[in-house]
């Protein structure tokens, strides 16, 4: 307490300050990733009583899905299927909401697959000279980001331009 009052904390305990800052930053990352890590778990429902990622979000005329019925590994076909599904999203009234994918979020083990899918000019793992439509059309314009705090090594996520998508608020910023 004396060190804090006399502003000696940084000179007397330099490593503890850095460790505390790093620990707080990691805590924020873990909490942020927990939204995705728990997104399929029925024990963490959102406002409609379903998990964040569900094939049965209730709307006025039935249900709508924001995930595959059977989860798929990240590859060209599954990414294209997800993009088409996003473009066909419906709101509670059953109207198309005109969303587009913006960014692919992957765990560390999928970063190599994401790099090949997103940045290869030609189709991945084919002998043909076909163009990579994901690349040439900028289907995911903000590319991909590796989140080291995702706990499922084969889970991947697409963020969209939906106006009320993921938001992060800091009630009070960290002080340094």
Predicted regions: what is each one?
Residues 3-4, 43, 51-52:
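Residue-level preference for alpha-helix termini and adjacent loops
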Residues 13-16, 30, 37, 116, ...:
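General N-terminal targeting signals
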Residues 51-92, 98-103, 109-176:
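Sequence/fold signature of self-assembling virion shell proteins
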């Amino acid at each position: 307490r004396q060190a804090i009052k006399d502003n000696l904390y940084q000179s007397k305990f330099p490593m503890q300050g850095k460790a505390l800052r790093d620990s707080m930053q990691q805590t924020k990352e873990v909490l942020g990733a927990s939204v995705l890590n728990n997104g399929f778990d029925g024990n963490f429902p959102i406002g409609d009583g379903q998990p964040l990622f569900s094939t049965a979000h209730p709307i006025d005329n039935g249900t709508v899905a924001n995930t595959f019925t059977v989860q798929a590994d990240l590859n060209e076909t599954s990414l294209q299927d997800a993009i088409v599904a996003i473009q066909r999203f419906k709101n509670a009234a059953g109207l198309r909401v005109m969303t587009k994918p913006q960014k692919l979020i992957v765990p560390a083990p999928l970063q190599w697959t994401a790099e090949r899918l997103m940045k290869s000019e030609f189709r991945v793992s084919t002998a043909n000279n076909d163009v990579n439509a994901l690349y040439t059309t900028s289907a995911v314009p903000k590319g991909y980001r590796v989140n080291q705090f995702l706990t499922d090594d084969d889970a991947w996520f697409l963020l969209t331009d939906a106006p009320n998508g993921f938001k992060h608020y800091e009630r009070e910023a960290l002080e340094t």
